[in-house]
Swiss-Prot record:
Residues 288-303, 446-462 have a biased composition (Polar residues). GO terms for molecular function: DNA binding; mRNA binding; zinc ion binding. One of its GO terms (cellular component) is nucleus. The lineage of its organism: Eukaryota, Viridiplantae, Streptophyta, Embryophyta, Tracheophyta. The keyword Disulfide bond does not apply. Residues 1-13 have a biased composition (Basic and acidic residues). This is Zinc finger CCCH domain-containing protein 34.
């Protein structure tokens, strides 16, 4: 602090603070540091601590900027004595980047022509970029980001459409494909006469649809099947999808529409329902198939790896299949699982294996977690069997039951499979009914009626 007592001696020295303050751009901290003389070298360095000079190392940026170094003698960078000369060479002119001969070249400066560290950068910034010519200016897109065709694309820019580094980013920022530049005015095209397309729905009025020639474009109408346009009684016309087009002989179990029906076979819309769907006739072919067979080609389409030195794949040994396929690291023996010649599946998609033990889980819960790969039987019990052909209870034969008798005769009459009872079944029933009608009333019944009539006569006489 004794430096304040010797202003004359300080004035004789070359104070680099004059050069520092002659150029703009200092912060509010650097100028007072220079006035206080908190520097370590000959450029106004008081204080007893000396900083190491390492000419082969880069300059200590913090020391050049503030005049002090927190690491002291342990700092591994260079601390020149004449700090003012170094800063004067760096800031020879306003806005110039430092030229440090013998130091590595600033790669960011060589690519972009700019340096975000400015005068504090510790690398060399040659005046002539690269091969002796001036650094070519970076071309910018209309979005304001640099275009560098030879560099890697900026992943953040491709993901978000923005880049926080802006002009200093060293990656390429291509223009998105959807936005190739400012929108240009479309050229006016003279409308050309187009051949009229034959419509398959003549009741649709084309005046309500704007013409495609107003926009200079040629639009085509989507193709519909014949009869897909219907007039709805509740509002505007309705267009049905191709899957709902009515035609004769429609069956819900047919695969697909293989050909377009002819207009002659088209049923009239008025005789159909509101949506033009033809109801199924009673004579339509019913789906009576309960089981389906799995072709054996599916089992041979996969080949599993043979690894004798590895443990066996337990899933393959249990089900005969492996979801990992050729990438499974376990052994898949060929002779472990017998070849599948054909599997018969039930209506719920479980295998039927006559002669094999029944699946206990399916017998208890009605489901099987292994599905078609289960090796046990999944046959439905006789009490739970269902026949799709028995569609109504009215079709089932009903045996006649006599009204007057509590039970039939001792020997039960045979029941016919047809709806009409046979002669042998009707004869004992009729005879029992006749005998019941001709039977006299019991005595108790006649006595009760006599007592009731006597009580009525006594009340009237009194």
């Amino acid at each position: 602090m004794e430096r304040y007592g010797r202003p004359g001696e300080e004035g004789s020295r070359s104070d680099p603070s004059l050069e520092w303050t002659s150029h703009g751009g200092e912060t509010a901290v650097e100028a007072p540091m220079w006035r206080l003389g908190l520097s370590g070298g000959g450029g106004g360095g008081g204080g007893g601590e000396s900083y190491p000079e390492r000419p082969d190392e880069p300059d200590c940026i913090y020391y050049l900027r503030t005049g002090v170094c927190g690491y002291g003698s342990r700092c591994r960078f260079n601390h020149p004595r004449d700090r003012g000369a170094v800063i004067g060479g760096v800031r020879g002119e306003a806005g110039a980047l430092p030229e440090r001969m013998g130091h590595p070249v600033c790669q960011h400066f060589m690519r972009t022509g700019t340096c975000k560290f400015g005068a504090s950068c510790k690398y060399h910034h040659p005046r002539q970029g690269g091969g002796g010519g001036s650094v070519a200016p970076v071309s910018l897109s209309y979005l304001g980001y640099p275009l560098r065709p030879g560099e890697k694309e900026c992943s953040y820019y491709l993901r978000t459409g923005q880049c926080k580094f802006g002009l200093t980013c060293r990656f390429n920022h291509p223009v998105p494909l959807a936005v190739q530049g400012p929108p240009q005015q479309p050229q006016q095209q003279q409308p050309q006469p187009q051949p009229q397309l034959q419509t398959i729905y003549p009741t649709l009025q084309s005046q309500s649809i704007p013409s495609s020639q107003q926009y200079g474009l040629v639009l085509t109408r989507p193709s519909f099947l014949t009869g897909s346009y219907l007039q709805s009684p509740y509002g505007p016309p309705m267009v049905l999808p191709p899957g709902m087009v009515p035609y004769s002989g429609w069956n819900p179990y047919q695969a697909s529409l293989s050909a377009m029906p002819s207009p002659g076979t088209q049923p009239s819309i008025g005789s159909s329902s509101i949506y033009g769907l033809t109801p199924l006739s009673p004579s339509a072919t019913a789906y009576t198939g309960t089981y389906q067979s799995v072709p054996s080609s599916n089992s041979t389409s996969k080949e599993f790896p043979q690894r004798p030195d590895q443990p066996e794949c337990q899933y393959f040994m249990r089900t005969g299949d492996c979801k990992f396929g050729s990438s499974c690291r376990y052994h898949h023996p060929v002779d472990a699982v017998p070849p599948k010649t054909g599997i018969v599946l039930s209506s719920i998609g479980l295998p039927l294996r006559p002669g094999v033990a029944q699946c206990t889980h399916f017998a208890q819960h009605g489901i099987c977690k292994f599905g078609p790969a289960c090796k046990f039987d999944h046959s439905m019990s006789s009490s739970l069997s269902y026949s799709p052909s028995a569609s109504s209870l009215t079709d089932m034969p009903v045996a006649p039951y006599p009204i007057g008798s509590s039970s039939l005769s001792g020997s039960s009459a045979p029941v016919s499979s047809s709806n009409e009872p046979t002669k042998e079944a009707v004869t004992p029933a009729v005879s029992s009914m006749v005998s019941g009608l001709s039977r006299p009333e019991p005595a108790e019944t006649s006595g009760d009626s006599a007592s009731v009539s006597g009580s009525i006569e006594a009340k009237t006489s009194s």
